[in-house]
Amino acid sequence: MAKTALITKAARKPKFKVRGYTRCQRCGRPHAVFRKFGLCRICVREMAHAGELPGVTKSSW
């Protein structure tokens, strides 16, 4: 889990736009965040396997 201070810091509007970054809405992870879902890759995978993300299916070819 992310530190509470870092989550609150990320929620504030940055002084410069380029300093802003995405965080996972579920766990607060700052890396590998899918913009479409607002979740990190780990949370997307867990929620997709549990069937909590509508329209997401496991691919097979």
UniProtKB/Swiss-Prot annotation:
Keywords: Metal-binding, Ribonucleoprotein, Ribosomal protein, RNA-binding, rRNA-binding, Zinc. Its cofactor is Zn(2+). Pfam families: Ribosomal_S14. GO terms for cellular component: cytoplasm; small ribosomal subunit. Binds 1 zinc ion per subunit. It comes from the Bacteria. Transmembrane segments: none annotated. Zn(2+) binds at residues 24, 27, 40, 43. GO terms for molecular function: rRNA binding; structural constituent of ribosome; zinc ion binding. Belongs to the universal ribosomal protein uS14 family. Zinc-binding uS14 subfamily. This is Small ribosomal subunit protein uS14B. It comes from Kineococcus radiotolerans (strain ATCC BAA-149 / DSM 14245 / SRS30216). The gene is rpsZ.
